């Protein structure tokens, strides 16, 4: 995901910047010990410290001969004589099943030791990207999967289309198969139109009017099933999953609620 990539980029910059501050500390201390001017190095170091502080809030502690130590506001040491190495394993592709909680996405390490990111390295832009990946992204995925489930289940009632064989999927499918509630995670990425009416898959549009299991076209003017399909969308019902409140909602209301939740997040 984009957030995971951004985390990797920020960790890479932090490691480079901490090494630069370590070297500048040496230069400044050496110059001052010889009685020279280190103003240029001090300015360069301050610019780097400012950038580090925007990524992770820090406390800068003076040391002898103009050197500094760097600690996060959570108390983690990033540099005191020597810079630490911040570890993070980037994922090229993040799927709906991957979360930090499930240990399928990387957290952070300091010199190879796991740290509680929210405490040791919380705040700043780095913390923001973790929030997007591990909180808002997960919530949005759950809501989107719940929307997809609701859409499938609205058209799965056998009484809605009596031409379908028992157990066959309705108008919307889970990768062209019937939906199993235990497989809800990632459903939004598998949601597909039934191939019976998908012309790209060899289906026939007239089956929207005559039924997914119909073998021959029916009367052109018969809109009974089409009206029933519209009714399924407009029906107020309780979503089987997700966080959409406690009231019954039509499909349009669900999508509106989802959009509102994204805006708030």
Per-range role (PLM):
Residues 1-265:
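Structural signature of extracellular appendage/secretion-system components
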